[in-house]
């Protein structure tokens, strides 16, 4: 299978076609979504491979697989570069891939805490008491909805680890500040400061 493909690149160029020579083995080329589909003619046979062992006399040759019949070829990105300067190829991404990559539940860069909105007692809407005057007889007024309580699912373990680490850093900073305040208010420090001012 790959021998035929590599022979296209590494073999000597074919002589110019004569009227009595058979046509090219590629019968149809279609490009679909960046893929080049090449269908081989049914009558095409691969040239004999000199390294291949001859088949036993009692056995028929193996049937070609489906991959031998057609190829899906796509050029590398360096050959499909677009733009005036033929710069690097712009990769197009699927919007669903972006959702998976940028979804907050998968983010490791969690800052702050999650906000949970609780619904309080319903507040009266001044617009609700007014009749809908600008609607025609056939139109329905849009239903007004109360804001729902927003509950977040538990954060994934890496996000929790980040939050716990930040909480630990805050505790260490608070302890260091408390030690510094105690140090400045200790009796020995005050006596040293008084002696320094007197001299």
UniProtKB/Swiss-Prot annotation:
GO terms for molecular function: ubiquitin binding. Its main location: cytoplasm. It is found in: Cytoplasm, Cytosol; Nucleus; Nucleus, PML body; Cytoplasmic vesicle, Autophagosome. A motif (LIR) lies at residues 26-41. One of its GO terms (cellular component) is autophagosome. Residues 47-64 have a biased composition (Pro residues). Pfam families: DOR (PF14839). Interacts with VMP1, GABARAP, GABARAPL1, GABARAPL2, MAP1LC3A, MAP1LC3B, MAP1LC3C and THRA. Dual regulator of transcription and autophagy. Positively regulates autophagy and is required for autophagosome formation and processing. May act as a scaffold protein that recruits MAP1LC3A, GABARAP and GABARAPL2 and brings them to the autophagosome membrane by interacting with VMP1 where, in cooperation with the BECN1-PI3-kinase class III complex, they trigger autophagosome development. Acts as a transcriptional activator of THRA. This is Tumor protein p53-inducible nuclear protein 2.
